[in-house]
Amino acid sequence: GCNCACSYCIVPSTRGREVSRPLEELVAEAERLAADGVREVTLLGQNVNSYGRDLQLAARQAGDADARLRPLFADLIGAVGSVAGLRRMRFTSPHPKDMRPDTFAAMAATPAMCEHLHYPLQSGSDRVLSLMHRGYTAQRYLERLAQARAAVPDLAVSTDIIVGFPGESEADLQRTLEVAAAAEYDYAYTFVFSPREGTEAAAMVDHFVDPAVVAERFQRLRVVVEHSALLKHQ
């Protein structure tokens, strides 16, 4: 599930709120997989880096004086990454608003962790990010990205970007192009906005961007991200 309220996303309505599995259960599953010969695992969650916050909240509500010591995502990385036999580990998908320096530290300290971060941008325009209810600004996004790269040398970074969100202006698109160029992605999953029935964004019909304009903007974005990828892989 997911506790966020992104205006274009139907997941919280269909999957409910976040539920973290106990750390011990996840480590035990990783140990079973490793014993069966599995060498790579992926920590998967709709908002994977918010892992453990619901467990902390439940502990506090139960009067547990040590609730704040309950494991969070960085602890999960370290615990699963230490399982004997596992050689590679990834996680997806994190949310930028919940990204913390201790996650980057855990990535750097865990030999099994692949040097890859999927870091969804969605838009480089603060105005559009606000309409999306993403909970971060472009500047904060880039600051966290710089911290990740400082902690994990040679980090490969991929992202998600949406073009044509309702009300997106040419200035908004320009800002997205600027941020995408500054981020220097290795790869980008790029999308044209598609309304999902039941979401806030789907009701913004009066602000839908002309499809021809969206298509042209999408191609301009592809040029930027493909140029960055080419430079990275030369």
Each model region followed by its residue ranges:
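Conserved functional loop/turn residues at catalytic and ligand-binding sites
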Residues: 1, 10-13, 37, 98, ...
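Canonical Radical SAM [4Fe-4S] cluster-binding loop centered on the CxxxCxxC motif
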Residues: 1-24, 57
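N-terminal pre-triad scaffold of radical SAM enzymes
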Residues: 1-7, 31-35, 39-42
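Short glycine/proline- and charge-enriched loop/turn segments
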Residues: 10, 57-65, 202-207
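Short, ordered loop/turn segments at secondary-structure junctions
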Residues: 14, 46-48, 193
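Conserved SAM/AdoMet-binding glycine-rich loop
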Residues: 35-170
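A structural motif corresponding to the C-terminal lobe/cap of the Radical SAM core domain
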Residues: 115, 127-234
